[in-house]
Swiss-Prot record:
NDH-1 shuttles electrons from NADH, via FMN and iron-sulfur (Fe-S) centers, to quinones in the respiratory chain. The immediate electron acceptor for the enzyme in this species is believed to be ubiquinone. Couples the redox reaction to proton translocation (for every two electrons transferred, four hydrogen ions are translocated across the cytoplasmic membrane), and thus conserves the redox energy in a proton gradient. GO terms for molecular function: NADH dehydrogenase (ubiquinone) activity; NADH:ubiquinone reductase (non-electrogenic) activity; quinone binding. This is NADH-quinone oxidoreductase subunit C. InterPro entries: NADH_DH_suC, NADH_quin_OxRdtase_su_C/D-like, NADH_UbQ_OxRdtase_30kDa_su, NADH_UbQ_OxRdtase_CS. It is a peripheral membrane protein.
Length: 203
């Protein structure tokens, strides 16, 4: 059942922010508002400062990749209002080449979150004070959480005793990629389990 306070908040935000929002979504007892790309800073500043909102805590920023969409990336901001005891998710959609305005001017703690999102997805943030990789190794190529990034990666690194240093080599698979069947009987699958033949002997 949806919390009545979230329904009231959604109505309030739609009235106050108007066309700065593309949509509001209720799912799993949570409220998500989708902001226009060019209005993300205004939206974040409003929900932080407005007396009915007070979402002063930014708890996370993350990316989501939808390769089939023109704007393939969602940038998701998780916010908390300690005074109202409410959580809010703000999303914005973008593509590989269009930067999102940095939230650092609104939430100073956004700096490392945006660096992580850039490192994992390649999402660009305009106005960021230090947009460089933070999790992957020096010289890493590609963005590992994109759906089109290979599971094995492109190179593997190891310490070479002879060279006395870390070296990078093309990935060599010790066995072929295997496709596991994770279907289990209680999920409704209809298939015969292998047996040792003892049941047939009893018949």
């Amino acid at each position: 059942m949806m919390d009545e306070s979230l329904v009231e908040l959604a109505t309030y935000l739609k009235n106050k922010l108007g066309n700065k929002l593309e949509e509001t979504v209720f799912a799993f007892g949570e409220l998500t508002i989708v902001a226009r790309l060019d209005a993300i800073t205004d939206v974040l500043m409003f929900v932080r400062d407005d007396s009915h909102c007070q979402f002063i805590n930014l708890t996370d920023i993350s990316g989501v990749d939808y390769p089939s969409r023109d704007k393939r990336f969602d940038v998701s901001y998780q916010l908390l209002s300690p005074r109202e005891n409410l959580r809010l998710r703000v999303k914005v959609r973008t593509d590989e080449n269009t930067p999102v305005a940095s939230a650092c001017t609104v939430y100073p703690g956004a700096e490392w979150y945006e660096r992580e999102t850039y490192d994992m997805y390649g999402i660009l943030f305009s106005g960021h004070p230090d947009l460089r990789r933070i999790l992957t190794d020096y010289g890493f190529e590609g963005y590992p959480l994109r759906k089109d990034f290979p599971v094995t990666g492109f190179v593997e690194c190891r310490y070479d005793n002879e060279a006395k240093r870390v070296i990078y080599e093309p990935v060599v698979l010790r066995q072929e990629m295997r496709n596991f069947d994770f279907l289990s009987p209680w999920e409704g699958g209809q298939y015969v389990l292998p047996c040792d033949g003892k049941e047939d002997e009893k018949k």
